[in-house]
Amino acid sequence: MAPKTGKMQHKDQKHPARTRSPRQGSRTEQDKRGPSKPGRNAPKPPSNGFFIWGRHAVQAALANPERRVATLYATADTGEDLRQSIAALPTSRSIDLPAVTITERQRLDGITPDGEKAVHQGMVAAVWPLDPPQLEDVLASAGTAPFRLILLDQLSDPRNVGAIMRSARAFGVTAIITTHRNAPEENGTLARTATGALEHVPLVRVVNLARAIEMLQAADITVAGLAGDGVMGVHSLAQFPRLAIVMGAEGPGLRRLTRDHCDHLVKIEIDSDADSLNVSNAAAIALYAAKTGA
């Protein structure tokens, strides 16, 4: 007798598995985890080095023969611009530079050491710090000609230091002098804020700022410290052809020993109901006054 044919199913096949598509508005596993962090797979700087980012800062670094560059990164839309910038450099410089590596924009977003999204404009350079000059060499090269210096008394914010460097570049400052301690090292934040000035204004580091002031005074350089209780107006700075302006940290201002070593204490007149000026703004005003007498 032939077996009956029918539609009976095994009990395990009663409800076959179905493939379901996500419903509208449902959360996938990626949604639950949240958006991926920008620069999660960001490039790493070389040992003892750092990143410089932004069009002006990177191009200034490329043009500086003293700047050692490990790697160059660009996005697809800026790679050709960066290559053309390199091609325009003297051959003695361009042959020392690495080829441009095209990289996804999101990877470059996360190169900052503080985790903030980098405003890199599609250009990043991995570099090593410049060799800092000695104060004695700076003074020797200046000779007896008129010149300007800035001294920073324990300014630790790289953004402030970078902004001061930018003003120093604009007003022809020969060098900026700071201390080894309580001062920022060369880094990307400083370079980005300086907008290329890091490659033009030497950053001199000294162990003791008071002794550095004594060296300047021995070289016939007038040292003027900016202070809210200064007795001279900032316009008076223009009378000194060889001048070093000392800036203190926001809040504490100049340390006592630094104040005692200054030849003059100078103030910037502000409205009586105003608290104070940002130190980088104060530096720009002082440099302008030293140049124009205004």
Language-model segment annotations:
Residues 1-140:
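N-terminal positively charged helical leader segments and presequences
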Residues 167-170, 189-197, 256-294:
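Structured adenosyl-cofactor binding patch, chiefly the S-adenosyl-L-methionine
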Residues 94-95, 136, 142-232:
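RNA substrate-binding interface of SAM-dependent RNA methyltransferases
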Residues 54, 153, 160, 276-278:
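Active-site helix-initiating loop/hinge in glycosyltransferases
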Residues 51, 99-102, 203, 223-225, ...:
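Conserved beta-strand scaffold positions in the cores of enzyme catalytic domains, especially
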